[in-house]
């Protein structure tokens, strides 16, 4: 949803979401080699590919690391926007390490230490946390803790975030950054969305774009998630993912069809 002023909204279709959700590509202006520093250590790598990550205004260039699995940089300023540390040596250390009794507490400490390098944690509030059970190379049980630190505007998430993954042995697995540099623009433009009723706009979108001309919305739409973002074209938008259930009316009097849930973003 994009608002030019408080009374003018529009629903983006096709082009923008294809750009954000498109496949990776080779960028002709990406440096063949790059180096970044994190935690006092320098990581070097060879260019692999690029993509517009969902909700970011910039292109991310990805590099296959010499001493990490991969890292990403902001194409506009060369800043580090993420590292995955999972090399063969990482897996060996992981298998040799022991499970921590206070695994969750230690994981959060590690995640906060990482995120604090990039964002003021007091501006994010409490992170959302998810736990994924998995195993190490030897097959031993292990948990992966995923932390999401996010700045919000009027209770709505923004793409100014830091996502951190830590295993139950206290090892930092990876981190990735959203569009931190665009928060000020999102904040400045947010007043233009004050009168916007997201639920109403989503309902209009379903009524206008759903593929069943004989269908009627019988449930929803329910918004799964919404967040502020800045497009690659420099416009502040609210991206909302929602789903609704339609009742399909058949033209054949002898045929019937159950309601069918349809999702839209």
Feature map (PLM): residue ranges:
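Preferential activation on post-signal-peptide N-terminal prodomains/segments
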Residues: 1-144, 148-155, 159-161, 165, ...
């Amino acid at each position: 949803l994009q608002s030019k002023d408080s009374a003018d909204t529009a629903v983006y279709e096709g082009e923008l979401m294809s750009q954000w959700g498109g496949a990776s590509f080779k960028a002709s202006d990406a440096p063949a080699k790059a180096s970044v520093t994190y935690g006092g250590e320098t990581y070097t790598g060879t260019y692999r590919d690029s993509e517009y990550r969902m909700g970011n205004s910039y292109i991310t260039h990805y590099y296959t690391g010499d001493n990490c699995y991969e890292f990403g940089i902001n194409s506009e300023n060369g800043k580090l926007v993420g590292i995955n540390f999972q090399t063969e040596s990482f897996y060996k250390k992981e298998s040799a390490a022991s499970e921590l009794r206070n695994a969750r507490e230690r994981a959060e400490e590690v995640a906060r230490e990482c995120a604090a390098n990039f964002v003021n944690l007091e501006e994010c509030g409490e992170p959302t946390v998810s736990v994924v059970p998995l195993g190490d190379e030897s097959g031993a049980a292990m948990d992966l803790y995923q932390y999401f630190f996010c700045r919000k505007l009027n209770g709505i998430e923004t793409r100014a975030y830091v996502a951190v993954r830590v295993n139950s042995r206290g090892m930092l697995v990876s981190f990735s950054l959203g569009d931190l540099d665009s928060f000020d623009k999102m904040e400045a433009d947010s007043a233009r969305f004050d009168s916007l009723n997201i639920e109403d706009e989503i309902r209009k979108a379903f009524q206008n774009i759903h593929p069943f001309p004989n269908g009627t919305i019988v449930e929803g739409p329910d918004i799964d998630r919404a967040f502020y973002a800045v497009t690659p074209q420099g416009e502040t938008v609210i991206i909302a993912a929602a789903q609704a259930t339609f009742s399909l009316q058949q033209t054949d009097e002898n045929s019937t069809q159950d309601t069918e849930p349809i999702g839209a973003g």
